[in-house]
Amino acid sequence: KKMKTVYVYLQDGFADWEAGYAVAELHSGRFFQPAAARLQVKTCALSREPITTMGGLRLLPDLTVDEICLGEAAMLILPGGDGWLSLQHEMILEKAAAFLAAETPVAAICAATVALGRVGLLNHHRHTSVDLEFLRMVGGEAYSGSALYEQQPAVMDGNLITAAGTAPLEFACRIFERLDVFSPATLEAWYLLHKEKRAEYYDALVKSMA
């Protein structure tokens, strides 16, 4: 059985840390529950040219957006970055729409949520974003989902996960939950360890893996 792929979209200046927790655990699989299938993480961009993150790291995309294979996909992750507001990302937004239509999860954080709002992809799911007023302003007529907006760090509704840029931990948790890779006990211990930074949660994490 072929390993499913989690695609991560890269663009110059993207916010390194926003998908950091999620991809580290998805790639390593170190806390996966026994029944969870291993996943591969692949990066995609508009071209195969190197991408420089907000942190100055140079990354070489694995493939271009048009090479994404929906049939092999487990999820599409869209990290934030200022480029979402200025550059054109129609191709990846079309892919996001195709993923949702195929009932394959899409996870967007920070400015990526605003980009989804601009193309009407937040109108039928409960969601969060940077700020509702900002989303309304930038989304314009394409955004009619304000009744479904929730003031939460991260929101999962069906196959759509959205998060504020300040919530990479909660974003990761919703991703692990949707992909069903952690046991409930592991998920809780993992989150509390990173959130509260107390030794008891490390012990709980180890115990959850026993």
What are these regions (language model features)?
Residues 4-15, 21, 28-47, 57, ...:
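Active-site-adjacent pocket-lining segments in enzyme domains
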Residues 54:
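A short, charged, and often flexible helix/loop element on the N-terminal side
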